[in-house]
Amino acid sequence: MNSIADINPTIAGSIEQAEAIRGSMQMKLDEMRRAYHQDPNPSEAERKHHLKQLKKLIGENTEAISKAISEDYGHRSEHETMFAEFIGTGGGIDDILKNLRKWMKPEKRHIDSTMFPFASNTVIPQPLGVVGLIVPWNFPVFLSVSQIAIAFAAGNRVMVKMSENSRSLTRLLRELSPKYLPEDKLVFIEETGGVGIEFSKLAFDLIIFTGSGATGRKVMASAAENLTPVILELGGKSPAIIDPDYDLAKAAERIMFAKQFNAGQICVNVDYVMVHKSQLDEFIDHCTAWLKTNVPTINSD
């Protein structure tokens, strides 16, 4: 099996090394595509096996993964990591396993009999091939594994480009992944400087990106060179609108919890609040009181 070289293009010979890692990624993509052509439509049993192996990967290495995430963060509570990264991820895989057979079945569709008399129409779900997944740092396990699971359910292979801020986790996943899944099914790539844009220039069959609008535009422009379809989940400015009749203390509690969870680094977190002018001071007082009780010092959460 070919492996992705761990190259840092910020040191001497950066141009040559950047070209080397681009070539390495292309070789891995070619290998995964050959494997796809040999097995273009995995059976239900194959897909379930891959999903179960993916769940085992995170389930059997929870402690090591939590430690790696904490190293990348500088510090992150293991309880927060358990809640944010593992519970929803494992439950999501279980849900896919439960529904996979139904999702794989062909479905009849209506057809205009005046245009196509005596014809029938059936939609047959088919894998796309090799999916390129670009993952941010804020929920690195949930936003990688949950989307890998979806791609596996659809019969695809996945190449994952992790964030430059998730180096410890990425190295761990690169070490663990081959023990559970073939390298022509799943591979993790570490961001070593400039890899992200080059990654999105590869001729994947689909690119999934989670991150900022500015970077999303660059990813989409790069993907357009190959007419690669993209799925973009981009951060925005999410409001919280408080009805004047709603319990103001409860609203403040829920909003402040969301703003403090994961240090507020959530794609759809509340960015601003719309509150009746007459209630503004009271709302601020409730927010301040919540913070003093739950986060009395900067390192107390």
Residue ranges and their predicted role:
Residues 2-121:
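N-terminal Rossmann-like NAD(P)+-binding subdomain of aldehyde/semialdehyde dehydrogenases
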Residues 11, 17-19, 214-301:
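ALDH superfamily catalytic-core signature
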Residues 34-40, 133, 241-242, 272-275:
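Short, well-ordered beta-strand elements within core beta-sheets of diverse protein domains
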Residues 36, 40, 55-58, 62, ...:
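Structural signal for hydrophobic packing residues in well-ordered secondary-structure cores
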Residues 88, 123-126, 267:
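A generic fold-level signal
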Residues 112-250:
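Rossmann-like NAD(P) dinucleotide-binding subdomain of oxidoreductase/dehydrogenase enzymes
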